[in-house]
Amino acid sequence: MTSRDLRAVLTAILLGTAATGAAALVLAAPAQAATVSAKVGPLLKEAQALIAAKNYKAAMAKLNEAEAVKSTPDDTAIINQFKGAIAISSADPNTPGGAKAKFAQDYNAGKFKDVIADAEYLRKNNVFDAQSQLIVAQAYFKAGDHAGCVRYTKTIPQSDTALELQARCAYEANDEATQRQAYEALVARSGKPEYWKGLLKLGERSRGLSDHNTLDINRLRLLTGSMGGKDDYIALAQFAIQFTFAAEAQAVLEKGVAAKVLTDDRSLRLLARAKQDAAANLANEAKNLAAANAAPQGDDLIKIGENMIGEGKAKDAIGVIQNGLKKPLKDPNNGQIRLGQAYLAAGQKAEAQAAFNKVKTPEKDAMVAHLWSLAARR
């Protein structure tokens, strides 16, 4: 019996099992025109028949007999390959190949709790790789153990796939803190719009948000490329108009029109209104700025600076907002966030992060400032 013949036998055996890729695992060595000895050949044929009958114990006994009479390196190689085939076919978890086979069979059979338990066999056989760890995490999810999934995904390498699963399990487990942490990690790693969508949706659900906080979250959707469609453009524009930031609303609506998202009459009427209001604001800007400079408090300067950001004059806005911060403010946090927003719009990311990071309380303002800071790291 040649090595090539034996490889064909082994392939047939392995393809009859549920161990995906098992043939490739065992038959990695190249075929060659070698033969096994006369005493070993018949024993291997008997072992083949026993394996086909799934009598693995008897097949192993035959291989042990062959082991006792082997006389060539080819004998040893083929016997070892047969043993590997038995380990995989029988899903013997005490061998590397068998542990992998049992793991795959249990997952394919939907035995997700067994998959979780199989991880210990993979560890013992030193074959518990990153892909297997992700499969265990998926098994926790499919078994409905979402809290267990959260705990487990925190112990494995934090790949994008692991973090995505962690966020999903955290959502199912009502663990908003972990969900936020997972999305923040994903945003920091790649900044993909889908990750920003998840993170900003969480931010939007936070309690006690002011309209200004909500405006900022909508601004961040536009900035991070995570706008969902027409409603997001309209919402951002309407909030901007509410705060008299008409130039910003105009820019947002024009982007929606350019993207062919805003084509209806209502959107076009809103754009016309924004253009009209923006022109009026610009005409009065010098007068309003002089009055704000003369005022004892700095809130009007902060607002004018915020409007200037929307007009595309971020560098000018920085100085105006800084002057506002030198005076008493009703809302110091807003002033600090606006300074960071102006720096970011001007391309000064380090200064923007420093400004955002000064906002510590209350939680709603600190959360929004933190989101801005994450955007400044892009």
Predicted regions and their residues:
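N-terminal leader/linker segments that initiate helical-solenoid repeat arrays
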Residues: 8, 22-112, 364, 368-371, ...
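Flexible internal linker/loop segments at domain or repeat junctions
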Residues: 265-307
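Residue at a conserved register position within TPR or TPR-like alpha-solenoid repeats
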Residues: 50, 87, 106, 140, ...
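C-terminal soluble interaction/assembly domains
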Residues: 297-378
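Alpha-helical repeat scaffolds
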Residues: 62-65, 91-104, 114-121, 146-157, ...
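Generic helix N-cap/helix-start motif at coil->alpha-helix transitions
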Residues: 36-43, 74-78, 90-101, 111-114, ...
